[in-house]
Amino acid sequence: MTLARFVLALVLGALPEVVSFDSVLNDSLHHRHRHRHSPPPGLQYPYYLPTQQRPPRTRPPPPLPRFPRPPRALPAQRPHALQAGHTPRPHPWGCPAGEPWVSVTDFGAPCLQWAEVPPFLERSPPASWAQLRGQRHNFCRSPDGAGRPWCFYGDARGKVDWGYCDCRHGSVRLRGGKNEFEGTVEVYASGVWGTVCSSHWDDSDASVICHQLQLGGKGIAKQTPFSGLGLIPIYWSNVRCQGDEENILLCEKDIWQGGVCPQKMAAAVTCSFSHGPTFPIIRLVGGSSVHEGRVELYHAGQWGTVCDDQWDDADAEVICRQLSLSGIAKAWHQAYFGEGSGPVMLDEVRCTGNELSIEQCPKSSWGEHNCGHKEDAGVSCTPLTDGVIRLAGGKGSHEGRLEVYYRGQWGTVCDDGWTELNTYVVCRQLGFKFGKQASANHFEESTGPIWLDDVSCSGKETRFLQCSRRQWGRHDCSHREDVSIACYPGGEGHRLSLGFPVRLMDGENKKEGRVEVFINGQWGTICDDGWTDKDAAVICRQLGYKGPARARTMAYFGEGKGPIHVDNVRCTGNERSLADCIKQDIGRHNCRHSEDAGVICDYFGKKASGNSNKESLSSVCGLRLLHRRQKRIIGGKNSLRGGWPWQVSLRLKSSHGDGRLLCGATLLSSCWVLTAAHCFKRYGNSTRNYAVRVGDYHTLVPEEFEEEVGVQQIVIHREYRPDSSDYDIALVRLQGPEEQCARFSSHVLPACLPLWRERPQKTASNCYITGWGDTGRAYSRTLQQAAIPLLPKRFCEERYKGXFTGRMLCAGNLHEHKRVDSCQGDSGGPLMCERPGESWVVYGVTSWGYGCGVKDSPGVYTKVSAFVPWIKSVTKL
């Protein structure tokens, strides 16, 4: 046993359920013997004219592949190799160039992807195929660069085996012609060259053969009598190519089943080009497909290259046209597809893009140049498939309106949320290093569809369509918002001034939130010292938003985590990115996360006018115009801004005008507010001591819908006693003319009253408490909400004995791990429940309880339905 087989036995023999040394050796020999007499998958055993048994192959089976040395490092790739959609060059130790994508063994078994090989490969020593392990392809390879290419495959018993590959499988050649551009088509399969019956053979089939052989852009179908071919198998008949396939194997066809080929003719071709024999023969060499490669011309009996001096996309357009390759034409420079050999045929090619052949373009004389093969020109003719991108309407393919191909039509991309990271991904896919977004309407508007909107790239994507985006065709844009881009090949003057990546967190939508920046590998926040709308405008501009921007301070969108990266930002409002505004050292600050800065982009806040009659007021009660999610009283969550439009706060006036929160309350109409009587126990019922704030969300940040209204009258229920919790209800009349005290808007609306003696446990569902009360750590700056269940009164009667009366509601969670309750700051605030029909009713006023969120101590709420006649008599509602 050779050393290589011994090593293979050690590695594989330990896993008998997967594969063993004996199975590899014996099964391999068995399969090779068996497949010489049975058809490989997908290809029937060929018949002959005249019919005759195929002679067996007599060469001995090859030895097992030795465990090769670790592969040498691949050559460094130029930055262009990052271009998405551009397949990497074939592994240098696979099948030779020209047939680099063979993925079938020499007896016809399809190869497994290298990523699909069983787990024992992961445990092997620094195995020779370390660079192949996990690769998402199944191309035959020879990792040590010395032996024949091979691959793993699944045998008939479901086990993994390996086999050598025949790199010529699927190859074609032309035989018997007057030159290399014509002849009978022969196909190589299962170790034997065979031919194709000429039935239904046409120019589309012939063109695929010419493409595969890189012998010009057009094939002309011919026929050859079988009588002159001798003994040769027939593989296929009725070949049905579309004409743009890369390989004849990709065309539809019928497996030859014997019988008589019509007219006894074999398929043949003459490779030419679309526009007459005066044009030179062109081929593309060294690419990953027939659609790209180094440009080579056939002139004076030999192949040669083209120098890339003045080589551009217009030249590439002509090459692709001459080769009958549709799609997007792009020029490549500096021997991108490898250096050629032989003479440099042409230099200084200057096509306009409209020529039919490179021969018609201005250029140097044949053979005149000052170039070496390091300057060999190349082209790619990218087929038009869904997701292909281009820049249109500019002076060249490096600039213009960004367009995406989808369902046979080019369309544009809306600039909503467009960032420089998006630009970077687009330019990189197009083969450029840098780029920038062009100004709006810089290029002519498109008249086609708008395919994409709200695109967001991280900058790591290799293809534009890997970025997050809306569904195809979903947008809210016009062509005035089409993205336009200018890309550049390099140079410091064109670098993207990306600054730090920026994101918005914990907002109600993607256009608002706490500002976080990515610095030194970690996301962190910005302190709000000096934070203004000008700073917000720069953040929004960097994120691609063009509308008005508003700054938010005091952790308006909640406190962040991690470091505070930046403080004392000083933007003028004209900068392109946040990085241009930072003057202080990163990480230097004197802040806490309670001062985290935020922004609202595309802000169009506008107050609604006040309502003036009772009928309109009653018609809008209990409506939540803004509610989509649910955060924290104790166990609660931040509410949505405007989500509880009847929530108001009773505030204690001060000489400094910054009255502190005293109690919560509920807006019943433009001029009347419902709260708890005990809120006035300490400071009395003098109206001069109080003010009511409506439309509030963050207690320390003034907002557009927020309004503070004076108090005209305080009405405490006549049965309330300060030493008792019964009859704990009060009404507050706001200052202002009749029903024009607080101005209604989407953020300021009244709640509905319940029916008299209505029992909410039977008629209501989906109950919430709201307020700015104790959150378990401190009083909240933002309005909180918490879902809460209504409980049978016996739970409170058992817990509070005679202190609980029939004019009270019992609500809350009894379990310690579900700590939801109202606390001191929420006194007087509403307990709201939803009636069928989506109207919200104030069933309770937060009154009292034992502690906050204490186990087995539910909250007690004044039952509003018991006081409806009193409320209506006072308010005249």
From Swiss-Prot:
Residues 95-167 form the Kringle domain. It is found in: Secreted. Residues 1-20 form the signal peptide. One of its GO terms (cellular component) is extracellular region. The active site is at 678 (charge relay system), 728 (charge relay system), 827 (charge relay system). Residues 31-90 are annotated as: Disordered. Residues 633-876 form the Peptidase S1 domain. Keywords: Disulfide bond, Glycoprotein, Hydrolase, Kringle, Protease, Repeat, Secreted, Serine protease, Signal. InterPro entries: Kringle (IPR000001), Kringle-like (IPR013806), Kringle_CS (IPR018056), Kringle_sf (IPR038178), Peptidase_S1_PA (IPR009003), Peptidase_S1_PA_chymotrypsin (IPR043504), Peptidase_S1A (IPR001314), SRCR (IPR001190). Belongs to the peptidase S1 family. This is Neurotrypsin.
